[in-house]
Amino acid sequence: MVAITLPDGKVRQFDHPVTGLDVAKDIGPGLAKAALAITIDGEMKDLATLIDRDVNLSIITAKSGQDALELLRHDAAHVMAEAVKELYPETQVTIGPSIENGFYYDFARPTPFTPDDLAKIEARMAEIVDRDEAITREEWDRDAAVKFFEDAGEKYKAEIIASIPADQKIGLYRQGNFIDLCRGPHLPSTAKLGKAFKLMKLAGAYWRGDSRNEMLQRIYGTAWFDKKELDAYLHMLEEAEKRDHRRLGREMELFHQQEEAAGSVFWHKKGWTLYRAVESYMRRRLEANNYEEVKTPQLVDFSLWEASGHADKFSESMFTIKTQDERHLAVKPMNCPCHVQIFRQGIKSYRDLPLRMAEFGSCHRYEPSGALHGIMRVRAFTQDDAHIFCTEDQITSETIAFCQLLKEVYTDFGFTDVRVKFSDRPAKRAGSDETWDKAESALLEASKAAGLETVLNPGEGAFYGPKLEFVLRDAIGRDWQCGTLQVDFVLPERLDAAYVAEDGAKKRPVMLHRAILGSFERFLGILIENFAGRFPLWLAPTQVVVATIVSEADDFAREVEATLKAAGLRVELDLRNEKINYKVREHSVAKVPVMLVVGKREAESRQVAIRRLGSQNQEIVALDQAVATLAAEATPPA
């Protein structure tokens, strides 16, 4: 007998081995028609997988969320590769995974693909869907698989398979005349893919991601379960392009970047004003929550990174220097080992804990040129970093306090939709399994006490401990991982951090690594795109522009400017001999939230015309009233 336990706890008994499709049919014809794949004891498998033992099973349909989408997109990559091989037989296939919101496949061919080619490939994909080709898994001996692909002129596939141990069976998937190396799972047929897909763009990619290898051609695409979802995604992309922080950064004169300092940011006056507004806000928040702000060195002897374990995990991302006296230094990629050095100065008592140590720490990490993206992916960045040294008994209370602070900060910046991931132990880690068991248990219990609903993010913890990842959803539905909280029993041990416990014994503190923004640069990029440059008044680099209609109003305009500045507002004065409509357009492009327009009549009556960004209307009010209203609006959150 084979006992199949379903997600609702019901058990179905079979007197013979069955496939996932058999189980779906046994439940009902509607489910059998909708079924795409199955999970067996949590692992996704093909619908045709034969089950000959007792298992926990769930059936994947189009309504199964991200698992179903990843399955669909993986199949879209294979169907695209099949279409390319039919249209351009001389092309060699390499790899084609699903990725966030889509898929890609890398191809090797002498002639570059063109946008016209993408249209042809997309049309052929639709034909393959109409053919309803069965997708079946086959297991081959490794050497036979290598020979098959070599004979087919597919040297890249042959190279991948040749790197697999000789005694390991190779999984291949066949659809029509197309055969590809793949772990699976896949849909049961090409018809299940549907036609809510689109090929998006072309790009270059090195074979195996190594710049010493051949350059391949990558085709990106997206796939969804229905056209409505596809259209919504394409609309979001259009909106995202309008909000691109790189374009708005230029238009608003916030920052620029150039090749001579790749991965770094040249902050212009307005951009630096925005940066400092965020920094000042965060500093007030930290002070109100009893954090000690510190500053640690940029250059630190490499031996500290070896002692901490970072050298083993991050050496390829670190900028290092050999000095004239043969010292090996590293520009710090993170702040945590340096904070431990401050903690170790002097004797610490249990009465000193929790000790909350914060730093707006400048860090540097090497990123490949192709991975750099505006100010969101850089090599030089500043973290809103803090480390809480506490006892094991204080983990829960400190987690609750941090989560409350994080929620308040995100709300003040306009983010109310926040999801939380729990990232457990990675394969490559420091510390014993016992230490990790304790750390994971402590963080899970603390997150529950803080009222958090977490989703497991397996294997994505830091090398020294598990972590919570806080993911913001922006105005157009995109997710951004920003905040983190990590429980660390390892680093205090490695770097010999200790405190005197109540019984006089020497004990290791627990170290909570936490950040809210992540990095200032990336968070500012997110803010620019979330608000499309239309910042709330308290954040706007220039909060008010005072613009004249006629030169007779210049003196009054200067008085308005001075009065606003005295009230703490960031003001620009525009006395140029230009038409007011021209001035309005120019300052609208710069996303200035408020314009105060003054002409001869306003100067005589000591009034101003308030014109807000995006509105065609203006309100005539007395100067004192305007200043009071705007000063209140521009006051940063407490």
Curated annotation (Swiss-Prot):
Q: Which SMART domains is this protein grouped with?
A: tRNA_SAD
Protein family membership: Belongs to the class-II aminoacyl-tRNA synthetase family.
The record's catalysed reaction(s) read:
tRNA(Thr) + L-threonine + ATP = L-threonyl-tRNA(Thr) + AMP + diphosphate + H(+)
Role played: Catalyzes the attachment of threonine to tRNA(Thr) in a two-step reaction: L-threonine is first activated by ATP to form Thr-AMP and then transferred to the acceptor end of tRNA(Thr). Also edits incorrectly charged L-seryl-tRNA(Thr).
Cofactor(s) needed, names only, are: Zn(2+)
| A GO cellular-component term linked to this record | cytoplasm
**Residues in TGS domain copies:** 1-61
| Protein name (record) | Threonine--tRNA ligase
Q: Which gene encodes it?
A: thrS
Molecular function GO terms recorded: ATP binding; metal ion binding; threonine-tRNA ligase activity; tRNA binding
Alphabetical list of InterPro entries matching this protein: aa-tRNA-synt_IIb, aa-tRNA-synth_II, aa-tRNA-synth_II/BPL/LPL, Anticodon-bd, Anticodon-bd_dom_sf, Beta-grasp_dom_sf, TGS, TGS-like
The EC number(s) attached to this protein equal 6.1.1.3
Location(s), subcellular: Cytoplasm
